[in-house]
């Protein structure tokens, strides 16, 4: 039986069945089918414009590709392992439909520059979709932050109560992180959006091609200017996966906090039932499975980043078969991040906040101690001295089991004669918040201003 591979003429025996399945990529690169067709149509148009492909052949290719695209979208195209990959499957189907015109499509092109183009086309679209999803999650967080711009909660360092903040301010920290994630994605897109097609196998082609015309047809900003680099590097995929890893790390941090806040010992929030599961043995359990799984999946995406870096670290120029291993980590990174963003945007809308529990935690942690120290500094006491005075006052209040604001003025004055009755304006959580009325501060007015700024940015 004649070997079905496009390169079989060089070999004296067919490839073994085990090797055939080991080296085939059609099991996963079929996802590139639509962009592969898009790239092929642009390549054909360029060949026609350059006089390499006749008008009749171009029209036949366009008709054939349209039919194949319909088959793919209807799930009717049968992918063959014998044909190795998505490129050869589509080319064989095209040739079966239109004859010799299909065989001419690959003129001036190699699978090396073809696959590099496909991945860039596909990833460009996925970056745009990811940026949109990041904006959706930011909007969900902004809605929740606006409802709780005045809701007092403890800010933490070392997981110990530190100073009062608002829940809205806390959520805006994650909006800032996600905004940077989107910026990284868009910056990465600039380097993704360069055309490898025309580099051929590694050295370019002898045909009179017009790479800039192909780039224009496909919406690329520029061409890759070195043929060796164009076909061999996957740094753009690594860069995207690094940006995706950071986004997942940010979501993992938020997940950790949601898990803590939902625990009965903290009780700051509740997550809607549709995002939780129960226990097969403990009837009372309501488990925050989504945040826990997001926390776990962040490691999955970081693992893909390490896999891609390791894949590229020792490859000589130019293309090597190693690069076939770039797709599954990249595909799964996109799938994991996008699914997580979709779920998270919905989940954050279903978060129930418990302001009383948050405020009680502030009062239990001497969160206004720094405010008392600042108060004394403004009265003329050096900060290191005020720090010592307040530490003694906290120790005394802690011994009584009361908050600083509950100590009588006379007792407070025993620690410093500079303390007067206006001190109680800074010892309440609300008083503490009100004093931090500057850009980036946690005063409710500043929280609302930042929400407005972010909404203006998102449009």
Curated annotation (Swiss-Prot):
Main location: cytoplasm
Cited InterPro entries: Arg_succ_lyase_C, Argininosuccinate_lyase, Fumarase/histidase_N, Fumarate_lyase_CS, Fumarate_lyase_fam, Fumarate_lyase_N, L-Aspartase-like
A single BP term in Gene Ontology: L-arginine biosynthetic process
Catalysed reactions, as listed in the record: 2-(N(omega)-L-arginino)succinate = fumarate + L-arginine
Pathway linked to the protein: Amino-acid biosynthesis; L-arginine biosynthesis; L-arginine from L-ornithine and carbamoyl phosphate: step 3/3
EC number in record: 4.3.2.1
Alphabetical list of SUPFAM superfamilies matching this protein: L-aspartase-like
EC class name: lyase
Top-rank taxon: Bacteria
Disulphides: none
Molecular function GO terms recorded: argininosuccinate lyase activity
Localisation: Cytoplasm
GO cellular component: cytosol
Gene3D superfamilies assigned: Fumarase/aspartase (C-terminal domain) (1.10.40.30), Fumarase/aspartase (Central domain) (1.20.200.10), Fumarase/aspartase (N-terminal domain) (1.10.275.10)
Keyword annotations: Amino-acid biosynthesis, Arginine biosynthesis, Cytoplasm, Lyase
Family stated for the protein in its record: Belongs to the lyase 1 family. Argininosuccinate lyase subfamily.
PANTHER family found in the cross-reference section: ARGININOSUCCINATE LYASE (PTHR43814:SF1)
HAMAP family for this protein: Arg_succ_lyase
Name of this protein: Argininosuccinate lyase
Name of the coding gene: argH
């Amino acid at each position: 039986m004649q070997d079905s591979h496009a390169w079989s003429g060089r070999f004296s025996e067919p490839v073994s069945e085990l090797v055939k399945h080991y080296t085939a990529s059609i099991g996963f690169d079929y996802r590139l089918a639509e962009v592969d067709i898009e790239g092929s149509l642009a390549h054909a148009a360029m060949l026609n414009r350059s006089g390499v492909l006749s008008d009749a052949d171009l029209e036949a290719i366009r008709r054939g590709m349209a039919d194949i695209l319909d088959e793919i979208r209807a799930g009717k195209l049968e992918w063959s392992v014998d044909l190795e990959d998505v490129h050869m499957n589509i080319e064989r189907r095209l040739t079966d439909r239109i004859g010799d015109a299909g065989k001419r499509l690959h003129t001036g092109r190699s699978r090396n520059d073809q696959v590099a183009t496909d991945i860039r086309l596909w990833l460009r679209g996925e970056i745009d979709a990811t940026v949109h999803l990041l904006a959706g999650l930011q909007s969900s967080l902004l809605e929740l932050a606006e409802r709780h711009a005045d809701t007092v909660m403890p800010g933490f360092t070392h997981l110990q109560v530190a100073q009062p903040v608002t829940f809205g301010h806390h959520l805006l920290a994650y909006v800032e992180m996600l905004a940077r994630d989107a910026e990284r994605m868009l910056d990465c897109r600039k380097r993704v959006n360069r055309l490898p097609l025309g580099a051929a196998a590694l050295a370019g082609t002898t045909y009179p091609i017009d790479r800039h015309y192909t780039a224009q047809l496909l919406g690329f900003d520029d061409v890759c200017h070195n043929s060796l680099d164009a076909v061999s590097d996957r740094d753009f995929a690594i860069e995207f996966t690094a940006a995706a890893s950071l986004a997942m790390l940010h979501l993992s941090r938020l997940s950790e906090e949601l898990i803590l806040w939902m625990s009965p010992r903290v009780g700051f929030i509740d997550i809607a039932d549709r995002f939780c599961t129960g226990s097969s043995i403990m009837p009372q359990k309501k488990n925050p499975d989504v945040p826990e799984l997001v926390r776990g999946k962040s490691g999955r995406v970081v693992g893909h980043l390490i896999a891609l870096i390791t894949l590229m670290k020792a490859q000589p120029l130019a293309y090597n078969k190693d690069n076939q291993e770039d797709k599954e980590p990249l595909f799964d990174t996109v799938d994991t991040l996008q699914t997580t963003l979709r779920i998270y945007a919905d989940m954050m809308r279903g978060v129930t906040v418990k302001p009383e529990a948050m405020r009680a935690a502030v009062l239990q942690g001497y969160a206004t101690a720094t405010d008392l120290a600042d108060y004394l500094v403004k009265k003329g006491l050096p900060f290191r001295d005020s720090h010592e005075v307040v530490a003694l006052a906290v120790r005394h209040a802690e011994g009584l089991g009361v908050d600083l604001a509950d100590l009588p003025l006379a007792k407070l004055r025993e620690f410093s004669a500079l303390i007067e009755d206006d001190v109680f304006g800074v010892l309440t959580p609300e008083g503490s918040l009100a004093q931090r009325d500057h850009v980036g501060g946690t005063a409710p007015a500043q929280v609302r201003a930042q929400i407005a700024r972010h909404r203006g940015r998102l449009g």
